[in-house]
C-alpha cells in the first residue's frame, strides 16, 4: 500500500519543469502557476493560466520540482481527476488540461462543456 497522497488534480513533471523555467526568467521566486475556469469559449467554459504571487483563502496548491500550481475552489470542482500538462508540438507549445469531467471540448482544447 502506498503512502502517496492522491491529489484531485495532477501537475505533471513536464508542466512543473516549464513553470520552473518561466519563473526563473521572471526573477520572481514567489510566482506560481494559477489555473482557472471561466465562462466562454466555443464550448461554454474555458481554461485560463496566469502567473500569480498570491495564494487566496481556499486555494489549493500542488508543489512539484519546487514550484506550485494554484487552483481556486470554484475552478477545482470542474477539474477534479484532471491533469495540467505542458506540450510542445506542431501547433506550438502550451499548457494543457486533461479533464475527465468534460463532455465535449473544442478543437483546440481550450474550452469544454460539462
UniProtKB/Swiss-Prot annotation:
SUPFAM superfamilies: HesB-like domain. Keywords: Iron, Iron-sulfur, Metal-binding. Transmembrane segments: none annotated. Pfam families: Fe-S_biosyn. Gene3D superfamilies: HesB-like domain. GO terms for cellular component: cytosol. GO terms for biological process: iron-sulfur cluster assembly. Required for insertion of 4Fe-4S clusters for at least IspG. Homodimer. HAMAP family: Fe_S_insert_ErpA. This is Iron-sulfur cluster insertion protein ErpA. It comes from Yersinia pestis. The lineage of its organism: Bacteria, Pseudomonadati, Pseudomonadota, Gammaproteobacteria, Enterobacterales.
Amino acid at each position: 500500500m502506498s503512502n502517496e497522497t492522491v491529489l484531485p488534480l495532477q501537475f505533471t513533471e513536464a508542466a512543473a519543469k516549464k513553470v520552473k523555467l518561466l519563473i526563473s526568467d521572471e526573477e520572481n521566486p514567489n510566482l506560481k502557476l494559477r489555473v482557472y475556469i471561466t465562462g466562454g469559449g466555443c464550448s461554454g467554459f474555458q481554461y485560463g493560466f496566469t502567473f500569480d504571487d498570491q495564494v487566496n483563502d481556499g486555494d489549493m496548491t500542488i508543489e512539484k520540482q519546487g514550484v506550485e500550481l494554484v487552483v481556486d475552489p470554484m475552478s477545482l470542482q470542474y477539474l477534479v481527476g484532471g491533469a495540467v500538462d505542458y506540450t510542445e508540438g506542431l501547433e506550438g507549445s502550451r499548457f494543457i488540461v486533461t479533464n475527465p469531467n468534460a463532455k465535449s471540448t473544442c478543437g483546440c482544447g481550450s474550452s469544454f462543456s460539462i
